[in-house]
């Protein structure tokens, strides 16, 4: 669904006299801060998440899954992130944190490092915990907070 159409639908349609947008809760409400925005991602694993929450991964550090990125590709991603002022680098916690943090630091972006699966970090025991970790991490980064 087009992000503009979705937002327009939520603003225009009402339930009990209030726009649906005012009634959003949970992850969809929290995700409003990053819906329609661009991020860089470490790996293509975020395709379904980015589609569901309408946040675009404009480029990937690891362009070919399972193959470490070349220094040249990393430089291309850094240049793109600087040019487009991409504010967030979204990555799983099993990738090289030093590389993730270096790219974020060199671009002025915030690294949001999260588990990919349940039990991938302390306190992430259920799918609901996992989704909350992802959504809250991105929302915090877009609000200027630490992740």
Model-found features: residue ranges?
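Extracytoplasmic metal-acquisition and chelation regions
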Residues: 1-147
């Amino acid at each position: 669904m087009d992000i503009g159409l979705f937002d327009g639908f939520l603003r225009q349609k009402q339930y009990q006299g209030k726009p649906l947008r005012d009634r959003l809760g949970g992850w969809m409400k929290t995700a409003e801060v990053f819906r329609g925005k661009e991020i860089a991602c470490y790996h293509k694993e975020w395709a379904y998440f980015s589609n569901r929450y309408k946040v675009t991964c404009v480029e990937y550090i690891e362009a070919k899954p399972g193959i470490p990125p070349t220094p040249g590709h990393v430089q291309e991603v850094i240049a793109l992130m600087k040019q487009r002022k991409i504010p967030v680098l979204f990555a799983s916690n099993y990738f090289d944190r030093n590389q993730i943090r270096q790219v974020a630091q060199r671009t002025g972006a915030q690294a949001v490092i999260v588990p990919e699966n349940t039990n991938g970090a302390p306190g992430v025991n259920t799918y609901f915990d996992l989704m909350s970790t992802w959504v809250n991490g991105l929302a915090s980064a877009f609000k200027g907070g630490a992740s």
